[in-house]
Curated annotation (Swiss-Prot):
Keyword tags: Chaperone, Cytoplasm, DNA replication, Metal-binding, Repeat, Stress response, Zinc, Zinc-finger
Protein name per UniProt: Chaperone protein DnaJ
Zn finger (CR-type) start-end: 138-216
Organism the protein comes from: Burkholderia vietnamiensis (strain G4 / LMG 22486) (Burkholderia cepacia (strain R1808))
UniProt binding sites for Zn(2+) 2: 168, 171, 190, 193
Record flagged with keyword Repeat: yes
Family statement drawn from the similarity comment of this UniProt entry: Belongs to the DnaJ family.
């Protein structure tokens, strides 16, 4: 049966404080303690599960390893040989590929043959919402992201001031141990020091032995002009710090563009709906439309129908990989007047009568519709 997440067992968040973890454990321990639940196997299992979770999460080093690698980081059996997990396979062949490429299987580089494993830090993702105008023109901004930094109290050693990490007695500072499985000799991460080659008898109270603390970091981010929704900006080296001297990961800023009140974006092109008076549609005229660069005007020919699309070249967005801007497509919607006065009604009736008497032509759409209706009734 797969182990449950330790945070889930205690019912706390992953960023829970030591006090919150201790309080949650005490509550569960009192509830499921064997003395309170004699001959209750289910309560006994819950008690053992809570005890194990507390032992791992109350220890700074073990908690850091668990946060990074899950159960495999704190349970040596999960990375063993004999097909019990992918970690065992990686460790079995790590020395061979490490000697050739300088990197062990599974992405863990080694400081040297038999030395502690070196891991690249995890990448981080930051979701950022910007306006269409900001995406079109680009701009510089700052973001604040939580980040792990070296502990100022122990200077990153993880040890209580006045003490220092000691050589791991299990692996003798190698970071790995060898296990014999029949004809095979398999090398795996040391279960006591988790590959560091050292252990900390007296952990730093400030960082709980991890050698790092979380703080908010302010970063400068340059949003390039023409960026589109869903694109990511890479900030090299601003991810999680590496382990055992490994390189840090990267930060990826994922861009999301807010819906615009006027425009819809389609690649480098923009679309907008433009209402126009029915008199302008019938008589023609000049209309003014908004663009991201200001206002622009263009002529509307007489007899313009609702739904007609006009293309304004170069009034869209200049994309990241384009030297010219896209176009703006204006979709006109002819407005029908409402709440007419008596005088306006009379004028429209006279106008309607003049159309019939004067033989004014219908629009192409209505003419086609009338022709189809005529053939339908014949």
């Amino acid at each position: 049966m797969a182990k449950r997440d330790y945070y889930e067992v205690l019912g706390v968040a992953k960023n829970a404080s030591d006090d919150e973890i201790k309080k949650a454990y005490r509550k569960l321990a009192m509830k499921y303690h064997p003395d309170r639940n004699p001959d209750n196997k289910d309560a006994e299992e819950h008690f053992k599960e809570a005890k194990e979770a507390y032992e791992m999460l109350s220890d700074g080093q073990k908690r850091a390893a668990y946060d990074q690698y899950g159960h495999a980081g704190v349970d040596p059996n999960m990375a063993g040989a004999g097909g019990q997990g992918f970690g065992g396979f990686a460790d079995a062949f790590g020395d061979i590929f490490g000697d050739i490429f300088g990197q062990a299987a599974g992405g863990a580089a080694r400081g040297g043959r038999g030395g502690p494993q070196v891991y690249r830090g995890a990448d981080l993702r930051y979701s950022m919402e910007i306006t269409l105008e900001q995406a079109a023109h680009g701009y510089d901004t700052q973001i604040r992201v939580p980040s792990w930094v070296s502990c100022e109290v122990c200077h990153g050693s993880g040890a209580k001031p006045g003490t220092k990490p000691e050589t791991c007695p299990t692996c003798h500072g190698q970071g790995t141990v060898r296990m014999s499985q029949g004809f095979f000799s398999i090398q795996q991460t040391c279960p006591k020091c988790h590959g560091t080659g050292t252990y900390i008898p007296e952990p730093c109270a400030h960082c709980h032995g991890s050698g790092k603390v979380k703080e908010t970091k302010t970063l400068e981010v340059k949003i390039p002009a023409g960026i589109d929704d869903g694109m990511r900006i890479r900030s090299a080296g601003n991810g999680e710090p590496g382990i055992n001297g490994g390189p840090p990961g990267d930060l990826y800023v994922e861009i999301h563009i807010k819906p615009h009140a006027v425009f819809e974006r389609d690649g480098d092109d923009l679309h907008c709906q433009m209402p126009i008076p029915f008199t302008t549609a019938a008589l023609g005229g000049e209309i003014e439309v908004p663009t991201l660069a200001g206002r622009a005007s263009f002529p509307v020919p007489e007899g313009t129908q609702s739904g007609k699309t006009f293309r304004l070249r170069g009034k869209g967005i200049k994309g990241l990989r384009s030297s010219i801007a896209g176009d703006l497509y204006v979709h006109v919607q002819v407005e029908t007047p409402v709440k007419l006065t008596d005088q306006q009604r009379d004028l429209l009736k006279q106008f309607e009568k003049s159309l019939a008497e004067g033989g004014a032509r219908h629009s192409p759409q209505s003419k086609s519709w009338f022709d189809r209706m005529k053939s339908f009734f014949e």
